[in-house]
UniProtKB/Swiss-Prot annotation:
GO biological process: clathrin-dependent endocytosis of virus by host cell
Keyword Amino-acid biosynthesis set for record: no
Protein name in UniProt: Capsid polyprotein VP86
Keywords (A to Z) from UniProt: Capsid protein, Clathrin-mediated endocytosis of virus by host, T=3 icosahedral capsid protein, Viral penetration into host cytoplasm, Virion, Virus endocytosis by host, Virus entry into host cell
Bias-annotated ranges (Basic residues): 41-50
Cellular component GO terms, alphabetical: T=3 icosahedral viral capsid
Region listing for Disordered, in residue ranges: 25-61, 707-743
Acidic residues: compositionally biased ranges: 712-731
Record site: Cleavage: P314, V315, N364, A365
Domain of life: Viruses
Amino acid sequence: MASANQAAKAEAKKVIEKVAKEVIKETKNSAQRNQGPGKRWNSKKGRHMPKNNNNKGMKRTVDNEVKQKLKKEGLEGPRSRFSVRVSATIGKIGPNKEQGPELQIATFLHPSLMKEPNDGTNFGPLQAAAAQWGLWRLSSLEVKCTPLVGSSAVTGSIYRMSLNLTQSPGNASWGGLGARKHKDIPAGKSVSWKLQRGDLAGPRQTWWMTDTNEEGGQSCGPMLEIHGLGKTSSTYQSQDWTGDLFIVEVLGRWEFTNYNAKPALGTLDRKSEDYASDATGPGIMVGDDGVMKMTLPTASSLARFMSDASERSPVNEGSVGETIWHIVDEGAGLASSVAPTPFSWLIKGAWWFVKKLAGRSGANADEQYVVYASLADAQNNKPVMANRFDHTKKATTLTVTQVNSPNTGPGVTQAAYHTENPFPLVPATQPPPPRSIVVVNATARPFGYVKYNTGDSNVKSHGKFDGTQYHFTLKRGSTVSYASAAYILTDVSMLTYEGNRVTGCYDPGWMEPTGITVHYRNESSAFGRVLAYEIDQWGSTSDNHFTIGVWLVQTIKDLPAHDTTVWPYIPLPYVSAGNCTAPPVQVALDKACVPYLTKVGVTSHQQCTVRQPQVRSGTFMLVYSIGTNTPATTAGFTTGQPLGEATNASALPEGKISTSGFWERALSAVAPYQDFISVKFTLPQGPHADPRVDALLDLIQQRFNLKPVDASESEDEDEDSPSGSEEEPCGEEPTPPQPTPRLKLAKEMMYEALRDSDWTHVDAEALLAAISSKN
């Protein structure tokens, strides 16, 4: 970029000199011709003679001729079609905390980025013009530094404004800053610095491109930097000065040409945040991969500002976003103490570029951002490679500017600018981004109630059948979990949150499946698909823990209403002795349990009847389990059976912090017929295979008799009939069936079936491979 700009200037200079010589020569010859021989005595002017204005006229003529020649040669590019004169505040200059040069302000002069930090996406006249025109340039610029404190109140510091034309940081020594075009600012004095078009000219015949997604050297424009030298002290007190010293404003005339509307360029934002302590501050790290990364606390406002919401599409785990962020370490916290070699100069320069790295190790982990040394490197995905450096956090002040917008067109689901109430929220017809925090709100009613007779019941069913049969089985591959209860949801809505901000409204029907299927009891065909899950453990010791698993499910087939017989359980605090007619009821204050439930007058575990309602395909459900099992290593699953003992009791520690909002409902035995419910989920890192494919394969297998029928399934209907038996549940798992000759010949039968069905558009080999893997 620099070489092209210099070449253009050199060519323009040659043309100007050539034109000037020709014009001067022609003007002199014309003057000599007009001067007659009889007037030569008047060549020496006395004091009484009027001054000759030929020099002024010659200068005016030269200027006009040069301008015409430059326009004819096309060295100034297209003419300006629109201009706007704007005064903008770009920030404040604070005190220097150390002796060395410290960066106070670094901002591009691009019209979309000329705004005060934390000004939001305010749509001023300059931003409106940037959103409509394809080329811009500055015809003039004046930088004003207005003091906020008198010169007698502070001492020890001087500041320097300089112009950086390279769009990349460097080793900022005080002498190096003086080698640029610059202006010094004494403390307490008002300073004005005027720059002309030649100082700010762009590489395209003095023009810059407006779209910041283009090459950085062609678009973002010059950068104004302000550094301070010397530690700032108070002259009235023997201590450091802590207040601001100057407010910085720019007054410039921006010119535009080549109409090319890109609305998103007018909404680029800029935010600043103070970090008071090292523990909660930003950090720098270099892992084993050698890539330098910046970290921010997840709960910080800058982390929410730089979230996945700024990306064009959801970012997959481990990938890097498209949005480029300009980071300025105004507090000099990182610049003064963090120095990963060999790029220590970059951090000490106090500004760099980052892109968001998707995925994190846990809900409380820091957000990570890949560091780039220049805007061109960020656009070309060339991160900073440095020696391994342990994660180091420091208290500082960061200012973050959104440099580009991957989608420069008008917003589809979220208005960039509006003046009316945004409600009612309209659900987006797309899934929320991975790792989003979503809250599902719905009207809910229990899946069933426990009944020992025809009387009324308000006790929810936590049902278990013989062996490992529960109301629901969750599967993905060979991993299995069990759920004993559920809620049926209606009027379902879903909101995404970042901190205390609502960031989106979504229809759960658009959610990506997690790859986990839900099976009614132990049926082979899937009853539903899991859209989100939350597994939470209370207690951490090997023998004292409770776990709940909550799965948001969308059914994919109908379940008719019917009565079934189960072994009931009931979640409670641990009851030691006593009853409601002979108080007090004695409970263990630190224990919870899910013991057997039985009717009055019976001491052994007795089966009961549960009337299950009809469930239509497409219904949303909350399937859940509670018991003494633990979270599995596979995300979205629990280990073992939740109800495997007589009492399923566990002592629980105090101070449990839960985020799902479901513990109280899971521990409650009594529930109304209908109630409002809210449950919080953290979405997984990425979508999985659609379980409807598995359901289709199951139907194909059943249609062509390619899958043997489990003998235990034919006995389910007999087990569902209430018998009033008081037998103890069988703890042994049924023996799986042995492969039959029919199963072994599945491949040959599938070939014949596909041939007879004329499914010419189906990849038979792929379908057979999938069916063979399922068996």
